[in-house]
């Protein structure tokens, strides 16, 4: 095996869906254009999801939670070199790195992992080993700063847009007679989909809005509730639930959409630290 330059220690990775998964995959692919990269996710990654690039290797750890970090430590000790850089998807993954490792550790910050006050001591313990903390936004940086107990850790902001395709050929949009709305996200409470449905239902009853189509793409715990709500609000004709979509289907939805809808808000200990999908929509010129 060629000399390992970067090890990415992560809890999650595609085919699991979400912004963090996309960010970790994009980071791994981009870095593997220049360095040998090994990705260590917690779960199985099917062969079709693995890169054909020989510089990018994925080693999975589909084990009970209490064993994952133990076996990741053993593996890291086996492959690490003096100049290997370690990148963690969050402070939680620092605990999967052997304690005697002196290599540089970069930790990514996404937002909601800094909301639980019960974890402040654990967060500070993990980040005491980090060289750099990279937040996805100034908002996330301030969240992390509030729990860092005056730490002098180098802390910077880099928006996670580095993996996005720049091809202008994908930006050609179709023209619609009927307005086409799009929501593309993990379907949970804080995405504001329920409130949007209720608002559209009121506008429809008051005849302040005519025909429209709303595609809701994604999966998650609120999907069944939203399907029931669309019937209760008499929106079953207008709303199309697409379920999980692959990149090809996602691009098709973006191309034919006029408005992107996702009024996300803080719910309990869950927030939108950055919201990469807003940038994807903007890339297609969708307000």
Predicted regions mapped to residue ranges:
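N-terminal strand-loop element at the rim of the active site
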Residues: 10-17, 22-67, 145, 154
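A short, histidine- and acid-enriched strand-loop-helix "catalytic/donor-clamping" loop
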Residues: 16, 93-95, 105-121, 131-132
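Short alpha-helical donor nucleotide-sugar binding micro-motif in glycosyltransferases
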Residues: 127, 244-245, 252-257
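Nucleotide-activated donor-binding/catalytic signature segment of Leloir-type glycosyltransferases, i.e.
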Residues: 215, 224-248
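Acidic donor-binding loop of glycosyltransferase active sites
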Residues: 255-270, 286
């Amino acid at each position: 095996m060629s000399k390992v330059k970067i090890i990415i220690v992560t809890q999650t990775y595609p085919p699991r869906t979400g912004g963090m998964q996309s960010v970790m995959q994009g980071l791994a692919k981009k870095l593997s254009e220049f360095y040998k990269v090994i990705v260590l996710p917690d779960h199985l990654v099917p062969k079709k999801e693995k890169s054909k690039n020989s510089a990018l290797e994925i080693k999975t750890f589909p084990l009970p939670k209490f064993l994952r970090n133990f076996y990741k430590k053993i593996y890291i000790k086996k492959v690490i070199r003096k100049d290997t850089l370690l990148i963690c998807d969050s402070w939680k993954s620092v605990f999967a790195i052997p304690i005697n490792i002196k290599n540089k550790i970069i930790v990514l910050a996404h937002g909601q992992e800094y909301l639980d006050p019960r974890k402040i001591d654990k967060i500070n313990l993990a980040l005491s080993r980090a060289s750099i903390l990279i937040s996805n936004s100034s908002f996330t940086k301030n969240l992390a700063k509030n729990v860092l107990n005056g730490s002098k850790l180098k802390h910077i902001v880099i928006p996670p847009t580095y993996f996005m395709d720049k091809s202008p050929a994908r930006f050609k949009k179709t023209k619609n007679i009927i307005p086409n709305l799009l929501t593309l996200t993990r379907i949970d409470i804080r995405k504001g989909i329920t409130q949007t449905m209720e608002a559209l239902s009121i506008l429809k009853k008051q005849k302040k809005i005519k025909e429209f189509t709303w595609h809701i793409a994604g999966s998650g715990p609120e999907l069944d509730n939203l399907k029931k709500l669309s019937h209760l609000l008499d929106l079953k004709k207008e709303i199309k639930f697409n379920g999980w979509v692959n990149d090809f289907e996602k691009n098709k939805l973006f191309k034919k959409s006029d408005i992107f809808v996702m009024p996300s808000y803080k719910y309990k200990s869950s927030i939108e630290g950055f919201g990469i999908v807003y940038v994807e929509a903007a890339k297609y010129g969708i307000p």
